């Protein structure tokens, strides 16, 4: 077994065992994508410094950490956002907490009709065909073990679709927060 993969195997098993409750479960291509991520990570394990993309990053400390699936986003309000001035910028604000889109913290009023900002979980359940041309298409999972691990645990996130010819009047600002707590 590759370095680092044995330590993560219980978490991979947990993800695959729980995958039936993940968004989009039962949709063939989504199930296959998650399985491909788990298989690719299992074949490689944690990246090592001898891997070209990771030569300056030592991930050995991760081998000693215990992980568990996040069961939701902890209570975070607008005042908790980093740098209060960030929340006041003239942008379309998108907030993701622990990998989950938080519509209550977003400021998307005025987006054109041909622009959709949605939670990945919602799209995986309601419109998986809209995601199929994109998910799992940019990289080879066998070459990117951390992306493979992330793919095995695919549950939520955010997606932005912009129609042809659309030019926004202000930028989309993504604020991604990782928060510890009971839900993390």
Q: How would you name each of these model-derived features?
A:
Residues 1-184:
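Glycine-rich and polybasic anion-binding loops at the starts of cofactor/ligand-binding domains
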